[in-house]
Regions:
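Residue-level marker of beta-strand positions
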Residues: 74-76, 91-92, 129, 181, ...
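Single conserved hydrophobic/aromatic residue that forms the stacking wall/gate
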Residues: 1-13
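NAD(P)H dinucleotide-binding glycine-rich loop of Rossmann-like/cofactor-binding domains
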Residues: 99-175
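Glycine-rich beta-strand-centered segment in the early N-terminal region that forms part
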Residues: 30-44, 59-102, 141-143
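Mid-domain Rossmann-like dinucleotide-binding core that forms the NAD(H)/NADP(H) cofactor-binding site
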Residues: 144-224
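Glycine-rich cofactor phosphate-binding loops and adjacent beta1-alpha1 units
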Residues: 167-174, 195-196, 211-284
C-alpha cells in the first residue's frame, strides 16, 4: 500500500516527531521528494546523546541552534521504495546516520566537520519515512534479531574505536582495562573478548548490579576497590560526563608504559588530566566518535558469523516501547532516563 502511494507521485507526505524544546515533542507534516531509497523505520534505539537534547543538558546556544529536530540516530527499517536498484522493497536495513558531503584522502568521513549527522543538527529517524542515499544503508540477513540490530550503530562506533586502537597500539596486548559499566562499557568489553580471546579483560565500574552482568569479563572491580597492583597494557574509557575525569586518572595510574588510552565517553565540559604521568609513561590517547559504512559492514559480518553474540547483547535491552503517538515517545524517553542499565528500544508503529 505504501509502495503504491510512493510510486504514484513525485512527492510524498512524511510525518515526523521533532523535539522543539527540552521534554517537548511536536508533530511535523511535510512533503519529501521520492528519490534514492525510502525506508520505513521499524526499531529505533535511544542513545545518551538523544537524552542530552531531551533533558536540556546541552548548552543553551546549542539547543537554540539545533532545535527543532527529530532525534534518534540508531535504528533499522524496511525499504519501501528504491529507484537506484540497490535494494528490493521489503529488505531489512540498518541506517547509517553519518552523511558525508565531502571526501578527504586522509580524514575519515565521521570526523569531517562538513559531514551531517542524524539527530545532531540534522533530522534523525523519528519519522514514518526516511530518505537516504543507498550507501547510507546496509542490508541485514533475514534471521537477524531486529531489536538488537536497532543499536548496531553503537556497536559500530566501538568496532571503529578498536580498529583505530589496533593501528596505533604497541604489540603487547595481554591485559585490557575497560572503565564504565553501562552500555558502552558492556559492548566494548564484549568485543575485546571476541577480538582478543587470549587477552585478559578487566572491567571497572560503579554499580555492582551492572558489573554482575559482565559474565564474559575475566575480572570486575568497583571503582573504589581496584587493587593497588592492578596493571593493564591498554585502557578504554567508557564513562563520559564529569565522572570521566576520575576514570581517566585511574587509567593513567594503572596503565603500563607506552600503553594506549581510548576515549569513548562524552563530557560536556573540559576535564583536567595528569599530563606529567602521560609524558613519563609515553602514553598515547585517542578519541573516538561516530563511525562509517565499513564499520557497519564489519558489525553485520561479525554478528552473522558469531550469532552467539546476540545472546550477550540481548541482556542490554531493558525497555521495549511501542510508539504510536507523541506521548508514547515522551514516555519512552522518561523510562530510559531512569533506567540504570540497558537500551530502550522503540517499536516504531506510526
Amino acid at each position: 500500500e505504501i509502495t503504491t502511494r510512493l510510486v504514484g507521485s513525485e512527492m510524498c507526505i512524511r510525518d515526523s516527531y521533532r523535539l522543539v524544546a527540552p521534554k517537548f515533542f511536536e508533530e511535523a507534516i511535510e512533503e519529501i521528494n521520492i528519490d534514492n531509497v525510502i525506508v520505513r523505520p521499524s526499531y529505533l534505539s535511544i542513545c545518551q546523546a538523544d537524552q542530552r537534547y531531551y533533558q536540556g543538558k546541552r548548552a543553551s546556544d546549542v539547543l537554540e541552534e539545533k532545535l527543532p529536530m527529530a532525534l534518534i540516530h540508531e535504528g533499522v527499517g524496511e525499504v519501501v521504495f528504491d529507484n537506484t536498484g540497490s535494494f528490493d522493497v521489503g529488505d531489512k536495513v540498518v541506517m547509517i546516520p553519518n552523511t558525508p558531503t565531502k571526501e578527504d584522502e586522509y580524514i575519515s568521513a565521521n570526523y569531517l566537520p562538513s559531514s551531517k549527522f542524524r539527530g545532531s543538527g540534522f533530522d534523525g529517524f523519528t519519522s514514518d519515512l526516511i530518505q537516504l542515499n543507498p550507501d547510507r544503508l546496509v542490508k541485514l540477513p533475514d534471521n537477524f534479531n531486529l531489536k538488537i540490530s536497532a543499536f548496531i550503530e553503537l556497536i559500530s562506533v566501538i568496532c571503529h574505536g578498536i580498529d583505530r586502537f589496533e593501528k596505533i597500539a604497541i604489540k603487547h596486548k595481554n591485559r585490557f582495562g575497560v572503565w564504565g559499566d553501562g552500555n558502552l562499557g558492556y559492548i566494548t568489553a564484549l568485543l575485546l573478548k571476541e577480538f582478543y580471546p587470549e587477552s585478559e579483560v578487566t572491567v571497572i565500574g560503579k554499580h555492582g548490579e551492572n558489573l554482575n552482568l559482565f559474565s564474559f569479563a575475566d575480572k570486575t572491580y568497583k571503582f573504589h576497590e581496584v587493587p593497588d597492583d592492578l596493571a593493564i597494557d591498554h585502557g578504554f574509557e567508557c564513562v563520559g560526563s564529569n565522572a570521566s575525569q576520575a576514570a581517566i586518572d585511574q587509567i593513567i595510574n594503572t596503565i603500563n608504559p607506552q600503553g594506549s588510552i581510548i576515549l569513548f565517553g562524552v563530557s560536556e565540559y573540559p576535564i583536567p588530566i595528569n599530563t606529567r604521568l602521560i609524558l613519563e609513561k609515553g602514553l598515547t590517547i585517542q578519541g573516538i566518535s561516530r563511525s562509517e559504512r565499513k564499520d557497519f559492514l564489519k558489525v553485520v559480518g561479525l554478528l552473522k558469523n558469531n550469532p552467539n553474540l546476540f545472546d550477550s547483547l540481548d541482556k542490554l535491552i531493558s525497555e521495549v516501547v511501542t510508539i504510536k503517538s507523541l506521548n508514547d515517545l515522551k514516555e519512552a524517553f522518561d523510562k530510559d532516563y531512569i533506567s540504570g542499565f540497558g537500551k530502550t528500544i522503540l517499536v516504531w508503529d506510526k
